[in-house]
């Protein structure tokens, strides 16, 4: 049976590095959406809670319910307001309609569109937003934005940061006008945390960095947490001239000992079609086309590490490490080691 092994020492190291850069554990909100980026939300939530993280963000209410006992506060990022919100959670408001559809008295964070144009209220909508917030008894606990290019060397980050600074000032003015408590503000994602040393927000909101993947530079000295392992199903000698797998994509030029391992694209891996060389963690190449539930390679023993750095697969498939990690099937066993 294939399995995902999570290095707990590496995870705690990453949390320590992030907390130190942010100015304390209390200033860190961990993003655990999509099964904690494929790592396993329940395991990661337990470890983060044990470390002392009190606040996390997830995609949906169903995700929040899975890890509710681990955190004091959970922000739901992608909820579509329906009037049936849970008072134990905090909900992101992604447009003006959400303010009128969400259950009265709900705890909310306003999303501010500072130039990404994906979700959020425009600056010009802020004053109008405070009407329904006040009238419907919504608890405005926070406001945030998302940087579209904090990992790129251009002016986008600085434009958005200035726009958010102006939005924060306007929100504070409106809080005074409507006699409401001041909310917390957050904007820095993993790349922004790595890139900049000064923060004028209350919290940072970190996703991929907790799992050991730097998005801008390696200043935090992060360590990958996840390694993917497959167990041997069978073994054989592939004779010179014989081919393995669908389409006979790999043919041996000499006798080699090969094995089939129990992991394939049905487990959430991008499908290797046998073109070029896709190295496993031991440096040996996958041989032939990947099957739905298995792949072949030179015999590496009872277990083989498929990867311990998602960047290797991301480079081969011309994608990003998020894409490799988040697709890993929730059916694969996960454990801390």
Curated annotation (Swiss-Prot):
One of its GO terms (biological process) is D-alanine biosynthetic process. Catalyzes the interconversion of L-alanine and D-alanine. May also act on other amino acids. It catalyses: L-alanine = D-alanine. GO terms for cellular component: cytosol. Belongs to the alanine racemase family. Its EC number is 5.1.1.1. The active site is at 33 (proton acceptor), 246 (proton acceptor). Pfam families: Ala_racemase_C (PF00842), Ala_racemase_N (PF01168). The modification N6-(pyridoxal phosphate)lysine is found at residue 33. SUPFAM superfamilies: Alanine racemase C-terminal domain-like, PLP-binding barrel. The lineage of its organism: Bacteria, Pseudomonadati, Campylobacterota, Epsilonproteobacteria, Campylobacterales. This is Alanine racemase. Pathway: Amino-acid biosynthesis; D-alanine biosynthesis; D-alanine from L-alanine: step 1/1. PANTHER family: ALANINE RACEMASE (PTHR30511), ALANINE RACEMASE, CATABOLIC-RELATED (PTHR30511:SF0). Keywords: Isomerase, Pyridoxal phosphate. The keyword tRNA-binding does not apply. It is an enzyme of class 5 (isomerase). HAMAP family: Ala_racemase.
């Amino acid at each position: 049976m294939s399995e995902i092994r999570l290095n707990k020492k590496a995870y705690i190291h990453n949390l320590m590095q992030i907390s130190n850069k942010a100015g304390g554990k209390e200033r860190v909100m961990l993003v655990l959406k999509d099964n904690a980026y494929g790592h396993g939300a329940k395991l990661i939530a337990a470890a983060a809670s044990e470390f002392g993280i009190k606040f996390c963000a997830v995609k949906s209410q169903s995700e929040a319910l899975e890890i509710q006992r681990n955190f004091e506060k959970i922000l739901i990022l992608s909820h579509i307001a329906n009037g049936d919100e849970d008072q134990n959670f905090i909900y992101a408001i992604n447009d003006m309609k959400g303010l009128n559809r969400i259950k009265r008295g709900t705890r909310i964070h306003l999303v501010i569109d500072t130039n990404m144009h994906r979700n959020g209220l425009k600056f010009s909508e802020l004053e109008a937003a405070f009407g329904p917030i006040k009238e419907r008894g919504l608890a405005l606990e926070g406001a945030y934005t998302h940087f579209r290019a904090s990992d790129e060397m251009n002016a986008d980050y600085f434009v958005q940061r200035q726009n958010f600074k102006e939005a924060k000032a306007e929100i504070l003015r409106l809080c005074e006008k409507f006699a409401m408590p001041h909310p917390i503000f957050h904007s820095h994602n993993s790349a922004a945390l790595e890139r900049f040393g000064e923060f004028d927000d209350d919290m940072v909101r970190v996703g991929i960095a907790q799992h050991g993947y730097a998005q801008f530079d390696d200043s935090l000295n992060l360590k990958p947490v996840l390694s993917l392992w497959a167990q041997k199903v069978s073994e054989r000698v592939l004779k010179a001239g014989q081919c393995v797998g669908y389409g006979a994509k790999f043919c041996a030029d000499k006798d080699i000992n090969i094995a089939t391992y129990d992991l394939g694209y049905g487990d959430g891996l991008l499908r290797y079609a046998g073109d070029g060389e896709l190295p496993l963690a031991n440096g040996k190449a996958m041989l032939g086309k990947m099957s739905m539930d298995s792949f072949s390679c030179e015999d590496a023993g009872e277990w083989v590490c498929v990867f311990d750095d998602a960047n290797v697969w991301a480079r081969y498939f011309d994608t990003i490490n998020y894409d490799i990690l988040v697709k890993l099937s929730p059916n694969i066993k996960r454990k801390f080691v």
